[in-house]
Amino acid sequence: MTSKRLGARFPGFLNRIGSGITRAARSDTTKRIPSAAGRAVERVAASEIGQRAIAGVVEGAATAALTGESVGESVKRAVILNVAGVHQTVPDPLNPVEIETQAKLRELDLANKREEAQIRHNKSMLQKEAQILGEVQHLMTVQEHVDQAKYEVRSGRALQAAQAIVKGERQQLDRVTKALIRENEMRTTDERKLIEGMRHNYSALAKSVDADSALIEEAVEQTVDIGGEIAEHATASIPFVGEAVSAGMATARGAMQIYRLGKTIHAITGLHTNHCEIPAIHQGAIETLLTSDSPTSDASLAQITSSRVRHLREIESELAHLDAEVKPAMQQMCQDIAKLAPDHLKKRRGVIHMNAAHELRVPLKQRPMIHSYTSPWDSDYVLILHVVGPYHSGQAFVFCLDLALDQFHFEEDTGSKPPVPPPRHRAPADFSARPAPISLSPLLAILTQRGCIGPGWPRVLMIRPCISALYRTRPPTRRC
């Protein structure tokens, strides 16, 4: 019964579907769909993109026919390039002029595009370089201001800093000297430790000096011999205190170059300031170690510290003189030079300072040091020393030795007046000097007493202690 009902209903269902499809196919909507699609295809074909696509199909087919390539690949490439707007028209293969012309046009077009891209790149680079150049100029301006500020601070405080360093060391040595003068029971624990360490260090130094004494003397004698030979054969004769001697050996030959110890302070004034050095081992210490029977006793150590304190006081006075006299002269000189300098150099403090340093330069023969000379004859026996004192002392003298004739000559130097205030090397108002050859015996007595020489003249060239002895015990001035 059930199967009969299904068999009766199924044909009816199919009839209903068939009638629906018939109505849909005959409806106006179905008729309008093909016409709309046709119109869309027509509009696409009439559009620019459609025209390019159609032209691409035609050009692809033509290219495939001419070149033998795959039709599908040629058509696809031509359609894509045409739609993208980068496809070139295929030249006539039978017209070589057209082919060459199109190739030249393509080359010119590519070259033009590269040039335009390069111009755009150059413009951007020029803008960046202009920006960087502006930043560099700004930094240079800032650097000039910083340098000027540094120079002003340095010129104003460097000498004060040097004075403070020297004063601090002198005060420490004063405390050490006072501790050495006291009895051992009166010293503090720190003072005892300090003196024990000082005694230990100088004991080791004294042993080294004793062990190497013979080698030092031999080296000094060899240096003197070589210096005399060089002076005799290689130097020119110039007038000097009424005699013809060799040109100056600016730094002392012989043992002075061996015992020159220490470091040079920073030259801020353009002047020669090597004499302001604080030596690591003072000449008084070397003198005491060589002459004292007990170089590590309290008395010897006190003598070492007191001699160093005197040297530090002299350096302190010299730095105070440079700060009070030379620094204002340097500043005034810088101002005068800046007024005359070109506009592009007025703000460059380094150039102005360099010119001022040259203006205030002290000649070599007037610099504070021991200038050693030797004669072109008998250089083994004749030695001339020009001792120029510090700037603040304004003193200098000439000391001549003739070991062959057993005589020496001492004379004040009054003719040197370098352009550094105040004028230096001037004698007292009532001073009048004349050549006064004196026997060498008093000199030998002084040097022997100071421990500077011994049998056979082995230590004559330890000249710094000798000169200090002569300066303190020089012969009386003779009046004309």
Curated annotation (Swiss-Prot):
GO terms for molecular function: structural molecule activity. InterPro entries: Capsid_VP5_Orbivir. Disulfide bonds: none annotated. Its main location: virion. It comes from the Viruses. The keyword Flavoprotein does not apply. Residues 1-48 are annotated as: Involved in membrane permeabilization. One of its GO terms (cellular component) is viral outer capsid. It is found in: Virion. Keywords: Capsid protein, Outer capsid protein, Viral penetration into host cytoplasm, Viral penetration via permeabilization of host membrane, Virion, Virus entry into host cell. One of its GO terms (biological process) is symbiont entry into host cell via permeabilization of host membrane. VP5 protein is one of the two proteins (with VP2) which constitute the virus particle outer capsid. Acts as a membrane permeabilization protein that mediates release of viral particles from endosomal compartments into the cytoplasm. Permeabilization activity is probably negatively regulated by VP2 and is triggered by endosomal degradation of VP2 and exposure to low pH. Belongs to the orbivirus VP5 family. This is Outer capsid protein VP5. It comes from Broadhaven virus. The gene is Segment-6.
